[in-house]
Amino acid sequence: MNPNQKIITIGSICMVTGIVSLMLQIGNMISIWVSHSIHTGNQHQSEPISNTNFLTEKAVASVKLAGNSSLCPINGWAVYSKDNSIRIGSKGDVFVIREPFISCSHLECRTFFLTQGALLNDKHSNGTVKDRSPHRTLMSCPVGEAPSPYNSRFESVAWSASACHDGTSWLTIGISGPDNGAVAVLKYNGIITDTIKSWRNNILRTQESECACVNGSCFTVMTDGPSNGQASHKIFKMEKGKVVKSVELDAPNYHYEECSCYPNAGEITCVCRDNWHGSNRPWVSFNQNLEYQIGYICSGVFGDNPRPNDGTGSCGPVSSNGAYGVKGFSFKYGNGVWIGRTKSTNSRSGFEMIWDPNGWTETDSSFSVKQDIVAITDWSGYSGSFVQHPELTGLDCIRPCFWVELIRGRPKESTIWTSGSSISFCGVNSDTVGWSWPDGAELPFTIDK
């Protein structure tokens, strides 16, 4: 074979090889395209099935929180959560908040809180000691997490609020507007369903803790009128976010603010703040038809702040150190009562739980259990109740729980801001321990210097 023939032969082989390679590449591309088309087609075909499955799961997850069980028997309180939001907020993006509270559905517990439209250690945190402003909003995040823009859900524009879950959706109540004409906006599953206008034109306000749901209906207490005199108080019954009934309390010489409410055996009990003239706490209990009873916790172990030293109580308001007050709670067990209160009698510091076995009906100051929650040398603040339904816990009773706000900043500390973190505890019938779980942040922050 001469050189020219060799060149032609080699060239022919290369050409054939190239053509075969090209055909294989074209075949591979066609195979990929066909495979992708089939895969995409299958995706489109399966989407309705996927949505159906999702909706079915959602429907299965929806229950009606009955609220017909009694409170679980307990002998103490186990720590449930601590968010450390002020400590984390010295370097992280954490909201400036007040009035945190916890509420649980049958699937989860969430921390709700009133933001100031500002972050800690930022210039907009200046002046956030103010209670009512158009920048305040109700938001929520998973319980135990520091509230930040990255884990929080907007709920409502509000400087006073409540929220609860009926087993199907979240109900939120957000009050905003001017002092002389505020409006409560009710949302169900995030959609506005009703409104309540201030009826006394004097700072309409509500619980700053969870509302209470029984058999698909949810209940809340609102106040309108003076904070240092006779005001007007109403109970509202709501179904799927709409007010279906309300009643004004006939309660001369009583004063109800910032009630902490819970279901128990199909009825609702609320323990509130008397900002007018009582250092013991007023209560109102009612059934699902809003037929109610009223009173004051009789115990000589006084629950408000400021308050006198423990002594002889009264089933009416105890006037000694009775003016002003702080949001709080108690749990009734027959004639006995678990009382949550600050350790200090004149400042919002420290916190303790006390079991008075006859304190709901008797006026002596004897008690049998005291559990430390926060040392008197550390700041506390508001406190309130929440419950965990059997649909969440798997128990055959309603578990009582409470949260404590740990206020930091103004007016007691040298900062430009006011905010707080929170801790929570739930009742158990097993071993517990008393200790101090303070906020623990080192102040001032960089913005304060």
From Swiss-Prot:
* Bilayer-spanning residue ranges: 7-34
The record lists its disulfide bonds as C72-C397, C104-C109, C164-C211, C213-C218, C259-C272, C261-C270, C298-C315, C401-C426
Top-rank taxon of the source lineage equals Viruses
Ligand binding (substrate): R98, R132, E257, E258, R273, R348
Q: Which reaction does it catalyse?
A: Hydrolysis of alpha-(2->3)-, alpha-(2->6)-, alpha-(2->8)- glycosidic linkages of terminal sialic acid residues in oligosaccharides, glycoproteins, glycolipids, colominic acid and synthetic substrates
Topology of the protein relative to the lipid bilayer: Single-pass type II membrane protein
Q: Which UniProt keywords apply?
A: Calcium, Disulfide bond, Glycoprotein, Glycosidase, Host cell membrane, Host membrane, Hydrolase, Membrane, Metal-binding, Signal-anchor, Transmembrane, Transmembrane helix, Virion
Question: What does the activity regulation annotation say?
Answer: Inhibited by the neuraminidase inhibitors zanamivir (Relenza) and oseltamivir (Tamiflu). These drugs interfere with the release of progeny virus from infected cells and are effective against all influenza strains. Resistance to neuraminidase inhibitors is quite rare.
* Keyword field contains Protein biosynthesis: no
Domains: entry comment: Intact N-terminus is essential for virion morphogenesis. Possess two apical sorting signals, one in the ectodomain, which is likely to be a glycan, and the other in the transmembrane domain. The transmembrane domain also plays a role in lipid raft association.
Instruction: List the protein's name.
Output: Neuraminidase
